[in-house]
């Protein structure tokens, strides 16, 4: 503790799990936006990541509410927001946004995209997996050209609807923080926009990591055309995100309100490691320099011509550093906004516990859970191009059966 703070400000109300929550939703939004680049904007270079991006978005979306539920004293009461909704509460209304994004956007798009494959996979096969896939077809076994065209059209329409839905899913988090007028660290009109672009950065970085790791685990060569395009998109998104954050910082510095003294003291003492070192230096500047040097951004072959193996290693390190930087961003927003007193004359401290519902182990378990969910989804719905490529020949044989039935 430093300076003068009120007695009820010594302990922080929002802890580590609340910082984990916007990090997870950001990954969901970023992964879905990347999928939309392939589906809606016909960016063929990133097509190999399309289905993987959808499954990753679903895996992280399933785990996203868990930090908030674990943070609540009575998580079973969370259903009250659906039974007795308060339309004037941004937090309550987000429950409906989450349900819309999960059931109407992600699940429907995945179903339309995989319906043909589910029908073919379930025919002539036995076992639990085949039974689950047969149930997932919902009885829609028509493989005619008309039905497949409808699947593609419906999937594209849902993706278009999903883009603003993804913005709303994560932008609302920045909206909640940015609308707190009494907190000078949070109150900013740029907060929702900064959250959105940082979500794009984290989502693209995650997909770059997943794409390379899954390729190596399957003993497949990494498609460098796709990896280079992902790195280029990551570079551009990172530039915009960093520019917006610097614009927000410059505006606060220029306004020099009465809170500037305590905020400067907080930056120099409490947030040196998480903001200056992790977020800005390792999480932003180092990745920007690395991507500018080796990725086809400034020049077609990069400023420094490097072999593919070294480029893959640099992309992997950049992806890891960006994840650390974006999580530090969420930490600095959530925790940093509670470290100074409302009197603007003192600072408190936040000590993370190892055990407990708001501890490091709980947060680590929640952060690892989406990978387990993604593994199960990949086993059920293989997203690899070679799995999809085998479908037409089998589907051609199965089509008369569907018409005869």
Write out the residue ranges for each language-model feature.
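TerminUS-proximal long segments
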Residues: 310-405
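Loop-to-helix transition at the N-terminal end of transmembrane alpha-helices
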Residues: 12-23, 46-58
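Membrane-interface segments at the starts/ends of alpha-helical transmembrane spans
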Residues: 6-17, 84-91, 146-153, 182-191, ...
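Transmembrane-helix bundle segments that line or gate the permeation/cavity pathway
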Residues: 24-42, 52-84, 88-141, 158-162, ...
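Peri-membrane helix termini and adjoining interfacial loops of integral membrane proteins
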Residues: 1-3, 75-81, 253-261, 338-346
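N-terminal signal-anchor module of multipass membrane proteins
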Residues: 1-40, 340, 375, 391-405
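Membrane-interface transmembrane-helix boundary segments in multi-pass integral membrane proteins
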Residues: 17-21, 92-96, 191-195, 257-287, ...
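Long, contiguous internal "core" modules enriched in hydrophobic/ aromatic residues
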Residues: 43-44, 105-312, 317-318, 325-328, ...
């Amino acid at each position: 503790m430093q300076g003068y703070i009120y007695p009820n400000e010594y302990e922080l109300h929002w802890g580590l799990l609340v910082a984990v929550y916007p990090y997870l939703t950001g990954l969901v939004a970023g992964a879905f936006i990347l999928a939309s680049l392939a589906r809606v904007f016909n960016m063929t270079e990133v097509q190999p990541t399309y289905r993987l991006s959808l499954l990753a978005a679903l895996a992280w979306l399933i785990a996203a509410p868990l930090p908030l539920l674990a943070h609540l004293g009575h998580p079973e009461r969370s259903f009250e927001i659906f039974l007795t909704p308060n339309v004037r509460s941004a937090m309550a209304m987000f429950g409906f946004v989450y349900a819309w994004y999960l059931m109407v956007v992600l699940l429907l798009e995945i179903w339309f995209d995989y319906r043909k494959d589910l029908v073919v996979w379930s025919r002539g096969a036995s076992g639990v997996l085949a039974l689950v896939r047969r149930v997932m077809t919902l009885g829609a076994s028509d493989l005619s050209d008309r039905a497949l065209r409808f699947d593609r059209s419906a999937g594209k329409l849902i993706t278009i609807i999903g883009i603003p839905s993804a913005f709303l899913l994560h932008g609302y988090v920045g909206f909640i923080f940015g609308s707190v007028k009494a907190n000078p660290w949070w109150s900013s009109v740029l907060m929702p926009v900064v959250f959105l672009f940082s979500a794009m950065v984290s989502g693209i970085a995650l997909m770059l990591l997943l794409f390379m790791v899954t390729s190596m685990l399957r003993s497949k060569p990494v498609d460098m055309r796709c990896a280079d395009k992902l790195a280029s998109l990551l570079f551009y998104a990172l530039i915009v995100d960093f520019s917006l954050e610097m614009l927000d910082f410059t505006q606060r510095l220029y306004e020099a309100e009465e809170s500037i003294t305590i905020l400067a003291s907080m930056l120099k003492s409490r947030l040196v490691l998480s903001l200056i070192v992790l977020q800005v230096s390792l999480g932003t500047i180092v990745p920007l320099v690395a991507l500018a040097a080796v990725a086809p951004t400034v020049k077609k072959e990069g400023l420094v011509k490097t072999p593919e193996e070294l480029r893959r290693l640099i992309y992997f390190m950049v992806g890891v550093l960006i994840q650390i930087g974006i999580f530090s961003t969420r930490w600095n927003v959530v925790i940093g906004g509670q470290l100074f007193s409302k009197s603007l004359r003192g600072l408190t401290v936040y000590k993370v516990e190892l055990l407990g519902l708001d501890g490091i182990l709980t947060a680590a378990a929640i952060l690892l859970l989406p990978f387990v969910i993604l593994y199960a989804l990949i086993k059920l719905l293989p997203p690899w191009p070679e799995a999809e490529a085998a479908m037409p020949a089998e589907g051609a044989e199965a089509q008369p059966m569907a018409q005869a039935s």
